[in-house]
Every structure is written in C-alpha cells, then in structure tokens.
Design a protein with these regions (language model features):
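Cell-envelope and extracellular/periplasmic
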Residues: 1-4, 151-153, 172-179
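Active-site histidine-acidic residue metal-binding/catalytic motifs
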Residues: 1-10, 27, 82-85
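Glycine- and acidic-residue-enriched helix-capping/strand-helix junction motifs
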Residues: 5-20, 160-163
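Short beta-strand-loop
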Residues: 10-15, 72-80, 136
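Short beta-strand elements in bilobed, periplasmic/extracellular small-molecule ligand-binding domains
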Residues: 26-36
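Caspase-like (clan CD) cysteine peptidase catalytic core
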Residues: 39-66, 70-128, 163-167, 172-187
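Extracellular S/T/G-rich loop segment that most often corresponds to the catalytic His/Ser-adjacent loop
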Residues: 113-162, 169
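An often Trp-containing, charged/polar helix-loop segment at the C-terminal end
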Residues: 187-194
Length: 194
C-alpha cells in the first residue's frame, strides 16, 4: 500500500489503513500475509520478486495494491512513492507493470491468483499530461486469475477519507458473510456494493 507520494501534493489516507484491515482479516482466516507500506520502485520490485519466489506450487495467492495507478496504452502501472511522472513514458519507466507482476506470480505455479487493485483514484500525476484521470484498463489476466478493481474500468474516483474506504468496507463485509461464495462472487458483490 502506497500513500506518501514524494512528488505529489496529494496525501492519501486510505491505502495503508485498508491494507492493514485486509491483512488482519486474512490473518484471522489463517492466511500468511506479507504487508508492505510506502515503497519506492526498487523496494516494490524487490518485494514482488521475493514474494513470487516463495509462492509454493499449487497455492492460492492474493495480491493487493492500494495507491495510485495509471494506464498507458491499455497497460496498468502501480505507482511507487518515489515516482516522478510528467509523461506517459515516465509511468512506464517508474511504475510497476500489473501484467508483468501477474506473470511472475503465475510462473511460480500459483494455482489461483486473486488480484485486488485499489488504484483507480484521480491522481496528480496523470493531470500533468492528460486533461482527465483515465482510471485503469482491463487487465489481461492469465487463466485461474480473478481480478477486481475498486472502480469500473476506465473510471477514476476521488479518494474519500473513510476508515476503511467504502470499497474495503464492502470487500470485508462480503469476505465475512456466512454464505458459501467463490472469490469471483465476493469480488462482484463488493464492487456492486460501492
């Protein structure tokens, strides 16, 4: 979760709180959790590399990111806190590719990958080179991957200070619901609840 962006006058409050709430819920359910906060590109990439290297074959993996994200040519990039973005090429250079990250995790033999990206915020970087925030595009996901974004595709939302955010509140509510559901059903109900 990234919130303290160095090259931005916008301070996010939800990403770290939401990541902690999700981590707590997953630990309560018996999952092993790796939680990292406010990482620059080098640390983000190293964390992803180390995480992917430890994925046991046949595991179910949940990858969550909250912070700023930018799409460039229908590819999504997670933005590290030390990114300096003034043009699309900067997002490609300084960002972390969602598609590459998915490929890394699947290459290690994850049976199922659950992807949650809460990065469709209107962000200060995009406004430097676009007249609007484009949100995130559809991610080409490998087989056995279920993906959800906090906003509809190609839409961006304002970061509203809530603890937890509306999206995370709905996701946690659906995860705790007593009914038997697939991850896809939980994700769909959470997003529809927002």
């Amino acid at each position: 979760a990234n919130a303290n962006y160095r090259d931005s006058d916008v301070r996010l409050t939800n990403p770290v709180r939401d990541a902690r709430a999700l981590a707590e819920e997953l630990r309560r359910d018996g999952f092993e959790v790796v939680l990292k906060e406010n990482l620059g590109k080098e640390d983000m990439q190293r964390t992803i590399d180390q995480f992917a290297a430890t994925v046991p074959s046949g595991a179910t993996v949940l990858f969550y990111f909250s912070g700023f994200g930018i799409q460039v040519n229908r590819q999504n990039y997670l933005i590290p806190i030390d990114a300096r973005i003034w043009a699309e090429r900067d997002a490609q250079q300084d960002g972390i590719s969602v598609e590459r990250t998915l490929g890394q995790i699947h290459a290690k033999g994850a049976k199922v990958l659950l992807l949650i990206i809460d990065a469709s915020r209107k962000n200060p970087f995009e406004r430097r080179f676009r007249s609007y925030s484009a949100g995130l595009s559809a991610t080409a996901v490998p087989e056995r991957t279920v993906a959800i974004s906090s906003a509809s595709l190609d839409k961006a939302h304002d970061d509203v200070d809530a603890n937890p955010s509306m999206f995370m509140s709905e996701l946690l509510k659906e995860m705790r619901a007593p009914r038997q559901s697939t991850a896809e059903q939980v994700f769909l109900r959470a997003r529809n609840g927002v």
